[in-house]
Amino acid sequence: MDGRVQLIKALLALPIRPATRRWRNPIPFPETFDGDTDRLPEFIVQTGSYMFVDENTFSSDALKVTFLITRLTGPALQWVIPYIKKESPLLNDYRGFLAEMKRVFGWEEDEDF
């Protein structure tokens, strides 16, 4: 019994740390993009909004492009594989990567985003 009392006293003597809450992004997690041109604007808005509110996580162009790549599937994922294999500079250029996506997946030039 003495051991228990000592243990309880020792535990009670420990400083109480406030629970650290993990920050949760208020923007819904972006859906995947498979190369459907009609869904490209929606994909860009979803991923851009998600990254915008979490600037600490997405602090560089490389991290932003990497995140976009994780949301690609099907033909869109197949499209990006050669860029990864040759370590394309576009992987470190968020705006350049978006411009290339728009070009490849048929974004009309007069549409500004």
From Swiss-Prot:
It comes from the Eukaryota. Pfam families: DUF4939 (PF16297). RTL8C is one of at least 11 genes called Mar or Mart related to long terminal repeat retrotransposons. They do not correspond to functional retrotransposons, but rather to neofunctionalized retrotransposons genes. Belongs to the FAM127 family. This is Retrotransposon Gag-like protein 8C.
